[in-house]
A protein has these predicted regions:
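N-terminal Rossmann-like or analogous alpha/beta NTP/dinucleotide-binding catalytic cores
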Residues: 2-139, 257, 296, 305-306
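Conserved nucleotide- and phosphate/pyrophosphate-binding catalytic cores
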Residues: 157, 163-353
Length: 353
């Protein structure tokens, strides 16, 4: 069996460092591992429209931004097929067929759907398209016969629902769809990176994101204003690590070699944490170290982004070609689904019997 990856993002704004540690870094690693026969990354514009239906221009203007983010982090269009969801109409038809295999109550029990509905204040009036997006995601995944789906922890219930749909379809209609497996970040700190203000999740509306496209000075300003331990008022005071956003980011991004380069007084992160906890280490020093760590990560991304920004027609062609390849693959899955459901009426004369 071919090993295939499908993953993607909603184009509702620039991607941030939470996206990077949550899934983008893993995608680049998997892409370069040589273990996968095909890799598809989807810019999920149709899904973004489920809560932006009255403002499609917001989605449109972010297509190229997200594509540039992908290329900046190291996604290679020679190894990975980047495509736009709405340019693959087969996904919509697959979604329609899968809807018959899922109950309303099952979607309502999905923890991710519950959280998203609450976050968007949809409790009183939920758009049908938004409510059904777990089913749409199942269509996205199965259309490309994905065996692996690298996502953040918050998307785990969505993949579980997809697996239920695959099982149900194969039980009712015969073995047709590929059962996908979830690929989660190995570092617990990467599962869900908090915002710079210590809030549970990065959000554009809360203004607590460090974007992959942020200039160097903007990143520095955001890090220096980060939430730490509110009781760590004086340098000599013992500091707490729990809920301290700066140390959460260090857990996610810091590598052993960063100490030799930026903070040679310490051998590793454990030593730094121990000093902070017993007192005598100020927040400013730790934040400056984190800034150096983050800049070393983001600087190569800025360089790659600048190169691609000067070649936007090429980026356009990458998306166009990628969408054409994706549509061809999805059509093959749709043909098999129709055949399994016995609704491929005009492929033979069986309808006349």
């Amino acid at each position: 069996m071919k090993q295939i990856i499908l993953t993607g993002d909603r184009p509702t704004g620039n991607l941030h460092v939470g996206h990077y540690v949550g899934s983008l870094a893993e995608r680049v690693k998997l892409q370069n591992s040589g273990k996968y026969d095909e890799i598809y990354i989807m810019i999920a514009d149709a899904q973004a429209l489920t809560d932006n239906a009255e403002h499609p221009e917001r989605v449109r203007q972010n297509i190229m931004k997200v594509a540039l983010d992908y290329l900046a982090v190291g996604i290679d269009p020679e190894k990975t097929n980047i495509f736009i969801q709405s340019m693959v109409p087969q996904l919509t038809e697959l979604t329609f067929y899968y809807m018959n295999l899922v109950t309303v109550s099952r979607v309502q029990r999905n923890p991710t759907v519950k959280a998203e509905i609450q976050m968007r204040n949809f409790e009183a009036s939920i758009p049908v398209g938004f409510f059904c997006y777990p089913i749409s995601q199942a269509a996205d995944i199965t259309a490309f016969n994905a065996t692996a789906v690298p996502v953040g922890e918050d998307q785990e219930p969505m993949l579980e629902q997809c697996r239920e749909i695959v099982h149900k379809f194969n039980t009712v209609y015969g073995e047709t769809l590929t059962m996908p497996q979830i690929v989660l970040p190995s570092n617990n700190a990467c599962m869900r990176l908090p915002g710079t203000d210590g809030k549970a999740k990065m959000s554009k509306s809360l203004g607590n994101c460090i974007y992959l496209a942020d200039p160097e000075e903007v990143v520095r300003e955001k890090i220096m204003s980060m939430y730490t331990d509110p009781d760590h008022i004086r340098v000599q005071d013992p500091g707490k690590l729990e809920g301290n956003t700066v140390f959460t980011y260090l857990d996610a991004f810091c590598q052993p070699e960063h100490f030799a380069e930026f903070l040679p007084d310490y051998q590793n992160l454990d030593e730094l944490k121990a000093h902070y906890q017993r007192g005598g280490l100020g927040d400013v020093k730790v934040k400056k170290f984190l800034n150096n760590v983050m800049q070393s990560l983001l600087s190569p991304m800025r360089e790659r982004r600048a190169q691609w920004e000067g070649r936007l027609p090429e980026v356009y062609e990458i998306l166009k070609k990628g969408s054409e390849i994706a549509a061809e693959t999805a059509q093959g899955t749709l043909d098999r689904v129709r055949h399994a459901m016995k609704i491929d009426y005009f492929t033979d004369i069986g309808l006349l019997k």
